[in-house]
Amino acid sequence: MAAELPPYTHVPGITPHPIRDPAGHAYGKAIPRCPKPTIADWQSCWPLKEGRTLFEAGYYWEAHETWELAWATAGRHGPIADLIKGLIKLAAAGVKLYENQPIGVERHARRAADLFDIARQELGDTALGYSIPALIGIANDTAIKPPERSALPPGTPAPLLSLAKAHA
């Protein structure tokens, strides 16, 4: 499913909730299912690719929600689900950047690093199009020294975090 980027990125308590609020950018939109992601055929699970696109553009809440679809389809448990949950946690750290909550950024980024490490123990160094050691590094760097929060108006996406170094 290829999607246009939303007109804003959701910041809880500030912008309209994308799904629940009639003014939300995804209100009333049907969400297609995706096949269960596997190591061999992960690209057929559209939320994995779309989540990456949203994340790279600074739409962290939307990436989080999109990756949750893949996580649920993956069964919520096991190494593939752990890797996806790590991506979800890293996106949550991005949301906390927008909310100016440094403790939340650190907590979510550290949990992401832990989940990536757990996944790497079973999946090896590369899975779902990512270098898992690079993901661990990105998450740890975010926890230790988060990027400066953008001075843009709330809801304006800013790519403060990037997964580019982890693309495999």
PLM regions with names:
Residues 64-67, 80-83, 103:
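Short acidic alpha-helical/loop segments enriched in Asp/Glu that coordinate divalent cations
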Residues 43-44, 78-85:
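Residues that mark the junctions of alpha-helical repeat units in TPR/alpha-solenoid scaffolds
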Residues 101-120:
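TPR/TPR-like (Sel1-like) alpha-helical repeat modules
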Residues 52, 87, 92-94:
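Residue-level recognition of tetratricopeptide repeat
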Residues 1-75, 118-168:
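N-terminal alpha-helical interaction modules that lie
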Residues 61, 65-68, 88-91, 110, ...:
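Generic structural signal for well-ordered, non-membrane alpha-helices
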